[in-house]
Each structure stands twice: as C-alpha cells, then as structure tokens.
C-alpha cells in the first residue's frame, strides 16, 4: 500500500517515483525480464528420470503442433505443492503439485498446451515491449503531475497542486492496469492456442475445463473477493465460458487417455505423493485403487522411504517380474540396495535401468556411477568416472553429477580433473565466482590447448550476461 504523498515533490522524488514504479513492473515480470538461468537456479527443482520422461511424452506432440519440436524447449519440475506452470525463455516449469493433483494425463497436457501457446506466440518478448511502454506511461504521468504541482505552488492554488499529486500517483496505477489487461489478453490467446494444439493432436480439451473448474472452486471456497481488473489472468469462470463451446464442438471432446498412459500417470502421482506429500497423501491415493500396479508401486516406495528395506525389495522384485523391461522398477531396486549398503547389487540394478531406458536420461548413469563409487575399488572408480561422464554428456546441468565426478576423480588422484568438475558444478549452479576460482586452479595443472584447459578457459571468460569476454 502506498502512503499518502506529501504536499511538495522535488525532482529527486519524481525520479524515485518513476524508477520505483519501473522496478515494481520489473519485479512483477521477473520471469520475463530477468536472466532465465539465474531465475531457474532460484527455483526448487526436482529431478526424476521417470517423471521427466512422462512429462516429455505429454509435451512432444503438443510442441510439434505448436511448431516448437526443434526449438529445444526444456521441461523443469518444481518442488511446489500448488497447481501451477509457467514459462521463462525456452523453459517450461511445472509444479509437482500440478502433477499430483491432476487426475488424468489430459489435464496436464492441457496445461502444457497453454504454456506452449505462450512460447509459440512470443508472449514474453511482447510483454517486455509492453513493460517499456508502461514505464514510459508512468514517467510521463509523473512529470505531468509534477508540472501541475509546480503550477499550483506558483499560483498558490492548493486545488491544482492536489490534482497534480493525483496525476502523479495515478500514473503508476494506470500503467499497472494497462500491463495487467495486456496479460489477461495474452492468457486468453494462449488458452485458444491450446485448444488448437489439442485438436491437432486428436486430444480433448475437457482437461483444461476441469483445471479451470478446480481454480474456480478453490476461489469460491476461499471467500476471497477479487478485483478482475487487478489480476494478470482472466477469472476461471470467464476462461471456462470462453472455451466451453470450442471444447464441446471438437470431434475429440470424448477422447480419453490411453490406459497405459493413465497407468504411468497414476504411478507418477503416487510417487510424488510418497516423496513430497508424506505418508497420508500417498496412502489416500493407494486406497483409491487397491491392488493396482500404481498402488503396489506406491507401497514399495513407502516401504523404501520409511526404512522397511526387506519389504521394499520384495515388492520391487514383484514389480520387476510383472514388467521386466521397466527401467524405473530397476532404478527403485537400485535405490533400495544402496540404502541397504549393497553397492555391487545396486550397480547391477542401475546398469539394467540404464540399458532399458528408452529416452537415455542422464540421471540413471549418474546413479550407476554413485553405486560404483561406493564399491570403492580403483577399477570401480574408473568405471564410475565413465558412467558419470556419460550421464553429464546427456544432461549437462545435473549439478549433483559434477559433485560425484569431482569426488571420483579426487579418489583416483586426478586433482586437476576434480577441480574442473567442481568448477562445472558451481558454473551450472550459477555460482560463477567459485566456478572461476576452481577453473583457474584446474588450469594450472592442465596442458594448454587440451579440451579440459579450453573448458576451464571458457568458464573463466564467462560473465552472467551469457557472453564470453573478449
């Protein structure tokens, strides 16, 4: 809430008012105007090979329909229990809360389609342009108000001076409402684009309507009175009204998700509930379909998380017998065996997971490398380095992987490589200061011109703007 303005306004305070409003706009649009990398690093990210593969399967046909198939859009899972998704740059962030609350794949696919509409429509760049216009609007209003204040003071007119203060204060409000109105328009455009993509891929839009109905129900239950002109999204009921006819006229309106996809979705929900929602949340989902594959998967996860490793291993083995080609059952078996301090058996399970993985996730080789490190022999450490490097080659931003790689190199006595791996970990964490320190330390013992030396030099030359120093 803004305090009441004083009766006089200096040039300094005019500048502060204009700059303050500009800062407010920029803060509100941090995902649009800020550094994408820095913003992503501030988000509590969740990494899981199984969930990432499923969400990418949801997104692939939608991205193709939106013309984004070859644009390298990254999908990032956020550890947040609220139902939300958003885009920054070429990254689509989806909260684990949305994945757990959505009862069908179609609901999440609708969310992805909406966000794809923002990316394909270039809405972020357009919002940047709108922000610049809004800043100009606020500055002009502030200056006009200041002029009226000066005129009022010169003529000893309190009314004119008061009107001037109203203009100055109202300029920011006017610009803010302009931005919000623009954002609401873009949200509606993204909704319509989403329906287009869903139709193009032969999928129903009912999931989108269900999502908006969920928002409307939550709003009604909260009892909150919302000014529709002071929010960045249209009201849920308005969004339903705008889309309902389009959805119901579609020949795909009654299409349902394939049973195999629904099963993977159910397994994902229970997994998220077990890890992030706690025992009560997981138990609620397990009881909805007792005896199902998803419920038995959840029971195995719960046994593992709560230390009943014997039961967890028995349940995991039963799941593997039922689906021997499922890489994530083998991954879970490896997790259980690692917790049971059986790294050799865990390494065998992780190796099977890596060989079965159709999407070649970078996470699974790192898990295999971790198990090989735990074995602790020189031969297993060398194999660990190979596996972790394989994983990082597929997924360069896996900062945990660099920590394991540095440790493995250190135990093998390869200190320059350990320091370079540490530099890489800091670099992808956004800690450029320490990244440069370790890169310089690594360079001292690396041969000039070799790949490691060149990579260290790239890190040393890097600046947060994303450009190399000349």
Predicted segments, located by residue:
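Short coil turns that delineate tetratricopeptide repeat
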Residues: 290, 324, 358-360, 396, ...
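Structural motif corresponding to the intra-repeat A-B loop/turn of tetratricopeptide repeats
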Residues: 306, 340, 375-378, 412-413, ...
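Extracytoplasmic and endomembrane cell-envelope/extracellular-matrix remodeling and assembly machinery
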Residues: 41, 47-49, 53, 75, ...
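Residue-level recognition of tetratricopeptide repeat
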Residues: 301, 335, 370-373, 407, ...
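Catalytic Zn2+-binding segment of zinc metalloproteases
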Residues: 116-133, 151
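Canonical tetratricopeptide repeat
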Residues: 298, 332, 367-368, 404, ...
